[in-house]
C-alpha cells in the first residue's frame, strides 16, 4: 500500500506568555472528541477542475465531515507550556465532491495538531495542521476516466492548514469555527497528477472529559541554546508524464519504466534562536534519474529506459531553512535556488531554478532524526522525500524561551 505523508510548515508569530492549568486535580492531558463539518469550493488550478471533464461543469462544491479524537494538553511538559497548551490527535473524515462519477467518494485518516497563537481564559486563537492519507479516489484512467488529470492514484496524501477560534460555551463543551485550505496529491508517484485544492469554512463541536479552564504560568523556563550542523540523506520515486500515459497500447506494458529514482544529500548549519525554533542555511545536492532520460522502443517492440548523462550529474543548490520545534518534532521549511546543473535540451527550455522543501521530522536519542518532506521545484511537487540524518551540536548556553 502506498504510504504518503504530505507535510507542511506553518510559521506563525507567537508571543512569550505560557500557560498552565488552574486546578491541581487534573493529573493528565484531557481526552476530547469532536465533530466537524466543512463546506467550500475547489480552487480552479487545472483544466479538469475548471470544467474540462465529462460533465463539462466546474468542480465547485466540497463537503467534508470529520470525527476527531484527541488530547488537550494542560502544561505538564515544558513544550506544552511554551506552545500555550496545544491539542493533538487523530481524525477520520468522509469527503463529497460534486463530480462523484469522476472523483469517487473518498475518505481520509489523518493526524492533527492545533497550535495556539493566543489563549484567553475561555477561548483561543489557533492554527491547525492536518497530515494524512485519503483513500478511494476514482483516479485517472485512459479508458474509463480520461479527463481526471487532478488525481493520479486511488490513494493520495492529505494536507490541511487552517486558522480557527475556539470558545468555551458550557462546562466541558467547546465551539470552534474557522477556515481550512486542503490539498490532495500523490507527490508525483503516479501521473498525471495535477492535484486538487479546496478552501472551506468549518464549524466543530467538542466535548472534553475534564475541566478545560486555564490560567497563565508564572514559572520561568530556560533551555540550552546551541548551534548545529545537520547532515541527511533522502530518497523518493516519481513518475514523469511522457507519451506512455497518452497511448493505451503502451501504458499497461511499459508503465514500470516510468518510475524514476531521486536521491538527495543535504547539509546545513542551524542556530537555535529560541526554544521554539531554529534557522539557518546550507547546501542541497540532488541526483534525479529522470533528467534527460528516454523510453525507447526497438524494432522488435521491446521497450527500455535510456538514461542520459544528466541522470548521473548532481544538481547543486543553496537554501535557507527554518524549523518550528514542538517537543521532539520539527516542522521544516527550506527555500533555495539551484546554482549548478547541466541541462538536457528539453530541461533548458523548461528549467526551474527555485526549489522548496516542506516537511516534518522526529528527533530520536543521540541527535538522530528521520522525516518526510514534499520536495518541490518551482512550487510543483517533485517527490515525496523520505530522509534520515544526524545533527552535530556545540556551543550550548542557557537562553530565555
Predicted regions and their residues:
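Residues that define the transmembrane beta-barrel architecture of outer-membrane proteins
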Residues: 29-31, 59-65, 103-109, 123, ...
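Outer-membrane beta-barrel translocator/channel fold
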Residues: 31, 35-55, 78-81, 102, ...
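Transmembrane beta-strands of outer-membrane beta-barrel proteins
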Residues: 31-35, 86-90, 123-131, 175-177, ...
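Residues on the lipid-exposed face of transmembrane beta-strands in outer-membrane beta-barrel proteins
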Residues: 35, 67-71, 109-115, 129-133, ...
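Transmembrane beta-strands of outer-membrane beta-barrel pores
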Residues: 37-43, 71-73, 92-98, 131-139, ...
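Surface-exposed strand-loop-strand hairpins of Gram-negative outer-membrane beta-barrel proteins
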Residues: 42-64, 101-103, 239-266
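Outer-membrane beta-barrel "beta-signal"
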Residues: 67, 197-216, 381-401
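Repeated loop/turn-to-beta-strand initiation elements of outer-membrane beta-barrel proteins
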Residues: 76-78, 121-125, 171-175, 211-214, ...
Amino acid at each position: 500500500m502506498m504510504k504518503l505523508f504530505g507535510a507542511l510548515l506553518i510559521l506563525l508569530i507567537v508571543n512569550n506568555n505560557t500557560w498552565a492549568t488552574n486546578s491541581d486535580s487534573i493529573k493528565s492531558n484531557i481526552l476530547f472528541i469532536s465533530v466537524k463539518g466543512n463546506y467550500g469550493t475547489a480552487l480552479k488550478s487545472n483544466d479538469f477542475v475548471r470544467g474540462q471533464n465529462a460533465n463539462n461543469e466546474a468542480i465547485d462544491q466540497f463537503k467534508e465531515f470529520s470525527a476527531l479524537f484527541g488530547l488537550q494538553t494542560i502544561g505538564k511538559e515544558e513544550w506544552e507550556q511554551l506552545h500555550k497548551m496545544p491539542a493533538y490527535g487523530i481524525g477520520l473524515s468522509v469527503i463529497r465532491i460534486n463530480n462523484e462519477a469522476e472523483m469517487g467518494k473518498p475518505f481520509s485518516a489523518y493526524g492533527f495538531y492545533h497550535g495556539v497563537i493566543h489563549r484567553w481564559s475561555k477561548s483561543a486563537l489557533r492554527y491547525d495542521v492536518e497530515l494524512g492519507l485519503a483513500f478511494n479516489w476514482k483516479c485517472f484512467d485512459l479508458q474509463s476516466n480520461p479527463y481526471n488529470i487532478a488525481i493520479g492514484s486511488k490513494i493520495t496524501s492529505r494536507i490541511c492548514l487552517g486558522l480557527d477560534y475556539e470558545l468555551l460555551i458550557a462546562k466541558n463543551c467547546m465551539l470552534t469555527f474557522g477556515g481550512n485550505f486542503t490539498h490532495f496529491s500523490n507527490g508525483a508517484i503516479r501521473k498525471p497528477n495535477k492535484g486538487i485544492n479546496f478552501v472551506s469554512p468549518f464549524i466543530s463541536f467538542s466535548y472534553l472529559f475534564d475541566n478545560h479552564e486555564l490560567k497563565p504560568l508564572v514559572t520561568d523556563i530556560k533551555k540550552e541554546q546551541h548551534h548545529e550542523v545537520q547532515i541527511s540523506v533522502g530518497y523518493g520515486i516519481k513518475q514523469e508524464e511522457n507519451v506512455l500515459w497518452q497511448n493505451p497500447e503502451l501504458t499497461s506494458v511499459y508503465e514500470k519504466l516510468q518510475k524514476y529514482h531521486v536521491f538527495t544529500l543535504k547539509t546545513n548549519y542551524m542556530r537555535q534562536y529560541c526554544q521554539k525554533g531554529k534557522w539557518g542555511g546550507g547546501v542541497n545536492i540532488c541526483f534525479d534519474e529522470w533528467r534527460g532520460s528516454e523510453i525507447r522502443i526497438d524494432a522488435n517492440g521491446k521497450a527500455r529506459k535510456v538514461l542520459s548523462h544528466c541522470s548521473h550529474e548532481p544538481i547543486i543548490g543553496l537554501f535557507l531553512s527554518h524549523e518550528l520545534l514542538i517537543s521532539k518534532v520539527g516542522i521544516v521549511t527550506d527555500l533555495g535556488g539551484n546554482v549548478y546543473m547541466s541541462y538536457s535540451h528539453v530541461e533548458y527550455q523548461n528549467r526551474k531554478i527555485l526549489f522548496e522543501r516542506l516537511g516534518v521530522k522526529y528527533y530520536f536519542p543521540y541527535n538522530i532524526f528521520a522525516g518526510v518532506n514534499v520536495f518541490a521545484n518551482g512550487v510543483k511537487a517533485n517527490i515525496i522525500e523520505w530522509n534520515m540524518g544526524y545533527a552535530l551540536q556545540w556551543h550550548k548556553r542557557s537562553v530565555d524561551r
